[in-house]
Amino acid sequence: SIQKVFCPEAPRIMLILNPAAGRGRAFHRLSEISRAFESAGCKVTTFITQKRGDASRFVMEHGADFHRIVCLGGDGTLNEVASGIARSGLSVPVGYIPGGSANDFARSHRLSRDISVAVHEILYSSGKQMDIGKLNTRYFVYVAAFGAFTRTSYTTPQALKNTLGYAAYLLSGIRDISTIKAEHIRITADSEVHEGNYLFGAICNTLSIGRMISLPTKFVAMDDGVFEVLLIRMPDTILE
């Protein structure tokens, strides 16, 4: 059960939904999630995205009017919400109910998909600070990457994701193998210079990338002000 929030006025919840996330499962959970917040004494206003960039725009235009901003969608939707927060300088707490296909962020933070648990944590937990990266003018929550398979998340058709879920990314990744090429990169990090031909590179703040690459938990902390850099060199031979 979810207790009521004690507040001089009903806590206003901005619920941002990506209806296509998770093969449409996020959309089908909307009513149950709204009822869970309302049963705790909250007033819920739902914003539904229709295209890329909507979530950031919603936050920048309306986020200041709410006590909590809750994202219901996948990693991409959460990234947009965080970008909107950073760009507008808001200090409104953000809650996340994972509803995507990969859910790397939720897995790294051990966030529950159970609605009652998720709503309770959003309303009553003390919350925590989290690092956000910035690349030129763009912000990212958990990874900024280049090279092999990085275009897959953008080019995988939504209809295919709706049908196959996470497997759609795998199929699209196989399709993209023929386009893989190395990038010559020079990187300075921690006063060290790394230069070479790389198939893949990522600046990340996560324990997993695309559910295919896992980082050791003892080296990763999402709130230490430090990002991890993952580089995969172009092999010199086929055996490598």
Identify what each model region corresponds to:
Residues 17, 40, 49, 87-203:
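Catalytic core of DAGKc-family lipid kinases
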Residues 44, 124-125, 173-185, 223-240:
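Catalytic phosphate-donor-binding core of small-molecule kinases
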Residues 54-57, 80-81, 104-105, 151:
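Phosphate- and divalent-cation-binding pockets in alpha/beta enzyme and binding domains
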Residues 190, 197-240:
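Internal anion-binding site segments
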